[in-house]
Amino acid sequence: MVRIAYSREKKIPNSTLLLSINDQKIDDFLEYQFYNDMTNTRKILIENKGVKKEVVFEPDEKIAIELEEPVYRQCENDCDFCFINGLPKGLRKKLYFRDDDYRLSFLIGNFLSLTNISKYDIQRIGRLKLSPLYVSVHTTDPKLRRRIFKNDKAGLIMQHLSSLIDNNINIHCQIVVIPGVTDGVNLFKTITDLSTLYPGISSIGVVPVGKTKHINSIPMVSRKLAQKTISLVEEFHKKFRKKYKTGMVYLADEFYIKAGLPIPEAQYYGDFPQYENGIGMARKFINEIKALNNTKKIKGKFLILTGRLALPFLEQLKRRLEKLRCIENGNIDVLAVDNLFFGNSVTVSGLISGADFVRTISKCEKKYDRIILPPTCVNDSGRFIDDKTINDNRIIVSPHNIKELIKCLQ
């Protein structure tokens, strides 16, 4: 059952329980959406103050109700490399919630561990067609996975994946490479095991473990390990292209940057199945830069701030704009922000605090008409990860698309 938060129907009081639609039991908002969309709703069963009541609708009448915010499942694991576990105090409150809920995986692409999933959940996922899902696998070795997740249920990963696939669910997997733990021989085995579940496993993303100054027990992926991992994964990628007509396994951009190797061409990424996981973002950015042409003159002086990881690509954008003569030399600067909040091992733009941006801007001797911040550095409310805001009318948070960014500058 699910509670109605608001109703425009006089016959349905607020805070009423919604029990069923057309005799289909409703357990949460997903079932409400599923059955309300797929059927021509004629009747619902509600309960208010212990009294059940059936409400009948006319053929052309729509249900005008809003449901209460659902309660999502929390993670039951205790991974040493968990970014949320290592967060300091004083950040945005929502950042501290460790979700591990298949509904959020389906709705917004959050990765889940499958350690809290039941047979009923799997059947329900199949019935509601909640596909695709995103799963953090890391390793298919049951003993090692139990140790990594510190959860006795973690060893059932291959069984859970197979059951979901049997219920016609497609899955995108993630492997976090932890030096000395999930790399090398173990990575080889994990990719091999997951590939046996193709096409149910649609893609495998391989990403380096994140390390901050608040998480000291995990070693960073070195340049040498990045190079070895690229060699291993690209062999699988070539093999899968021949066998399955798709690369299937893809490396995070960070591996190539760490290794000092070129970013693969767009064909490598196929339809970019794990773009939001930092896999293929650099290539799309590079191609957008190359596609820039006939850009109108940009007047004024601009500063683009970024994390160290993206610095080479934004410098490439600067050179392109100067080459097109749409901006005068010296009128645009690109600067990497040192991440003092999490430590300089954190180089992605989305994890730069408001305090670090303020510190960097205050040190700039040159005067700028516009200061461009990365698109991922604030939430929808304009707040940085440290819950701060910046009041400076020169600041523009960059759009994700380069052409839209250029429009902001003109």
Regions found by a protein language model. Name each.
Residues 15-18, 44, 82:
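Terminal peptide-recognition signature
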Residues 50-52, 58-172, 176-200, 210-236:
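Conserved Radical SAM active-site core
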Residues 4, 9-27:
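Conserved PDZ fold ligand-binding element
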Residues 145, 180-181, 201-225, 244-267, ...:
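Flexible glycine/acidic-rich beta-alpha junction loops that bind and position SAM and/or redox cofactors
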Residues 20-45:
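PDZ domains, with a preference for the canonical peptide-binding region formed by the helix
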Residues 260-410:
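Radical SAM enzyme core and accessory elements
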Residues 1-8, 34-35, 45-47, 53-69:
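PDZ/PDZ-like peptide-tail recognition elements
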Residues 132-134, 170-172, 203-205, 248-250, ...:
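Structural preference for beta-strand elements that scaffold enzyme active sites
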